[in-house]
């Protein structure tokens, strides 16, 4: 999810918090972490240095992950997670290169796998709370291919054509495609300036409403399966769009559903915070530290704060 960000505070902060819960950090030597002739370093000192917000974030994340693991451990398949990792390894050019990429992010292979598992738990939670029907998925998604002729944003750009030339070229291609739509892929491979999709005969896969340029989306969702559009102008240039037949809908349905759930959470973070609150109630969560409780309630479980910050403490520590 876009709203997921890395946790920069070590999880050991949670251990410090637990040591401070239910007691004053100055009324017991048990709360002294380090002693010296110059004075002691207590849990309270360390918490003050790190900051309550970060400790609340870390401890809430740790608690939430424990709850999610308990609730959804039987629904998450480790074999599928291993398959995800193998896929990533191939994308990075092998195990060693993937391992180096993880190290650059401060991750180990085990930690990465743990993050994937936690992400899967969150998906299960949101799937429980946000219901999306097959008809809604079909209404909000469209399988598409396109041919793009880029327009230069400035004369010095190496890629693309000036607006007039780009439009003229797109119109010529559209006429060619209209004569024989079965050659769309062949023409896309040869003419499209979107090199990523051109390699795949112009295929974009499934496009969701709200995911792309508004003019592109408007034109695409007007098309019937198999139809080809007129020339469409977008912020990227000129397109010829084809609505592909969704023959693989059933196999792609779950992935599309997860993306739509993600969109809903982006638009309305209250869906996520309400799901978290339900979990806290279900598992009788009791915050022993009033300050930590205040931070969690005011910031982590506050949908308005999530909108402003674009990140949730409860789903931190995940990198995919």
From Swiss-Prot:
UniProt keywords, alphabetically: Cell membrane, Isomerase, Lipoprotein, Membrane, Palmitate, Rotamase, Signal
BP terms from Gene Ontology: protein folding
Topology class, membrane: Lipid-anchor
Residue ranges occupied by any PpiC domain in the UniProt entry: 139-245
EC number(s) per entry: 5.2.1.8
Domain of life of the organism encoding this protein: Bacteria
Family annotation (PROSITE patterns): PPIC_PPIASE_2, PROKAR_LIPOPROTEIN
Lipid-linked residues (S-diacylglycerol cysteine): 21
Residues lipid-modified (N-palmitoyl cysteine): 21
Region annotation Disordered: where it falls in the sequence: 159-198
Molecular-function GO terms, alphabetical: peptidyl-prolyl cis-trans isomerase activity
Keyword check for Isomerase: yes
Localization: Cell membrane
This protein's record includes keyword Signal: yes
Enzyme class: isomerase
A cellular component term, taken from the record's GO annotations: plasma membrane
Family, per entry: Belongs to the PrsA family.
Role, per record: Plays a major role in protein secretion by helping the post-translocational extracellular folding of several secreted proteins.
Protein's name according to its UniProt entry: Foldase protein PrsA
Originating species: Staphylococcus aureus (strain MRSA252)
